[in-house]
């Protein structure tokens, strides 16, 4: 399967409560320690910048969650359905989130990522994110907690 054509990328829309069953199903499929329905619901209700991407048939294939504070965006979650990974949708969703952040006046974007998520780390580095720190024991893991790499990019 090839990446969606650019015309299909116009299907980003704000995440709403009706999307949560699909979002949580993808989250549970791709992560050993997924966000809960409550995490996503709290993000929607708190007014975070939360987005979903649907393909031309209406199937939810990617989503993202970001907070915006004055001139800084904090990307909390960017995920692509397993069957659509490695097609450029993570990159395109990152570009979308950066565009949204710039529209709100953000000059920088921060995120945390697991060191074990090598493909995500590489994507963020290609985009221009730089490693600026480590949060010790940030993520749950099977035996011990996993650190988070803190990254930042100028928008």
Task: Put a short name on every predicted segment.
Residues 80, 113-114:
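Aromatic-flanked redox-active Cys/Sec active sites in thiol-based oxidoreductases
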Residues 93, 117-120:
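Conserved short alpha-helix immediately C-terminal to the canonical SAM/SAH-binding motif I
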């Amino acid at each position: 399967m090839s990446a969606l054509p650019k015309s299909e990328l116009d299907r980003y829309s704000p995440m709403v409560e009706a999307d949560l069953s699909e979002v949580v199903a993808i989250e549970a499929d791709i992560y050993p320690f997924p966000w809960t329905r409550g995490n996503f619901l709290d993000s929607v209700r708190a007014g975070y910048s939360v987005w979903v991407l649907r393909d031309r048939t209406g199937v939810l294939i990617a989503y993202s969650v970001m907070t915006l504070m004055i001139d800084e965006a904090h990307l909390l979650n960017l995920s692509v359905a397993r069957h659509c990974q490695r097609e450029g949708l993570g990159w395109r969703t990152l570009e979308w989130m950066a565009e949204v952040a710039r529209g709100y006046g953000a000059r920088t974007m921060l995120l945390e990522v697991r060191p074990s998520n090598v493909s995500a780390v590489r994507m963020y580095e290609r985009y221009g994110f730089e490693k600026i720190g480590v949060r010790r024991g940030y993520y749950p893991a099977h035996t011990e907690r996993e650190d988070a790499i803190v990254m930042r990019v100028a928008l």
